[in-house]
Amino acid sequence: MANAVRIKIGLKCQESGDINYTTWKNPKTHTEKFEVKKYCPRLKKHTTHKEVKLKS
């Protein structure tokens, strides 16, 4: 199982509070919080999305 180290995270919009995207992350190589500008369908514009833990 090569992907056993990777964890699934959600990307939460900082303006609307919605979790719009999910992705995978290796916490050993990327220790800082993931932050990226992505499209928010509720607000219909690009906003900052930050990493949140998902319930398994």
Curated annotation (Swiss-Prot):
Keyword Ribonucleoprotein applies: yes
GO cellular component: cytoplasm; ribonucleoprotein complex; ribosome
Alphabetical UniProt keywords: Ribonucleoprotein, Ribosomal protein
Pfam family, one: Ribosomal_L33
Gene Ontology terms: biological process: translation
GO molecular function: structural constituent of ribosome
InterPro entries: Ribosomal_bL33 (IPR001705), Ribosomal_bL33_CS (IPR018264), Ribosomal_bL33_sf (IPR038584), Ribosomal_zn-bd (IPR011332)
Similarity section: Belongs to the bacterial ribosomal protein bL33 family.
Official protein name in the record: Large ribosomal subunit protein bL33
Lineage summary: Bacteria, Pseudomonadati, Campylobacterota, Epsilonproteobacteria, Campylobacterales
